[in-house]
Amino acid sequence: MRLNQNTLLLGKKVVLVPYTSEHVPRYHEWMQSEELQRLTASEPLTLEQEYAMQRSWREDADKCTFIVLDAEKWQAQPVPTEESCMAGDVNLFLTNLEDPTLGEIEVMIAEPSCRGRGFGTEAALLMMSYGGDAQTDSE
């Protein structure tokens, strides 16, 4: 969704940034994990397919995807590289385009060291707030 292409959401534990082509190699690496494939009901994709998926998510009017970054790592770096801070992703799927207040949020904390630390909870809360604010702004 182009709506979030220039958006950064800063929480206490996580930073949400738009999913761009620079994130694809790390994301693809995560999705080679059989555990993550099982937990997310995903099929393994080639790197080229992963790039195509990222492009389609960016263009779809009913999807909004952010990469979840570890805020502590991101803020500690003099020049933060997002790839080194990646923890997972969060998605908003609009389930009824006639009523954009209806949707589904999915969160994946792919980095094992980031699990159990509240990253998923904060990412979901930031996404709910962003979705509500974006809806209000578009009316």
Regions found by a protein language model. Name each.
Residues 135-139:
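Extended, charged alpha-helical interaction scaffolds
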Residues 1-114, 130, 134:
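GNAT-family acyltransferases
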Residues 116-130:
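Conserved acetyl-CoA-binding loop-helix of GNAT-fold acetyltransferases
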